């Protein structure tokens, strides 16, 4: 990689990582007491994607280990935010669905983060945010794609 390209890559990832850290910090402060970012992320995903998901599907979606997802799901189940049931077709698998309490918790979390997100969008401008989203999606897609074998 050329020196200019290397500097560009370092700048890009430095900005992405710094923004990620700041977003996580601000979200953690405004989420309802006891709710972690991982909890909100899973609840939001389940609310958007109707139907059930397996823990393995959720782990893959969030790019975490199955153990980490199991820990998050156990906490959400304990709080009454999700239902976990056996898969009737394959007893080795479980199925996860959001509960009515989980929908309410997710809605409360959205209400608590909306002012913070709205402020950021207002300062940056809606058009600039919209024009940035496709680039961020492409970056995410590039980073999530599996490396091709040699």
Residue ranges, per PLM feature:
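N-terminal leader segment of winged-helix/HTH proteins
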Residues: 1-33
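N-terminal positioning helix adjacent to the helix-turn-helix/winged-helix DNA-binding module
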Residues: 8, 23, 38-39, 101, ...
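Hydrophobic structural patches
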Residues: 16, 43-46, 136
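Alpha-helical linker/hinge and terminal dimerization helices associated
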Residues: 16-19, 23, 27, 62, ...
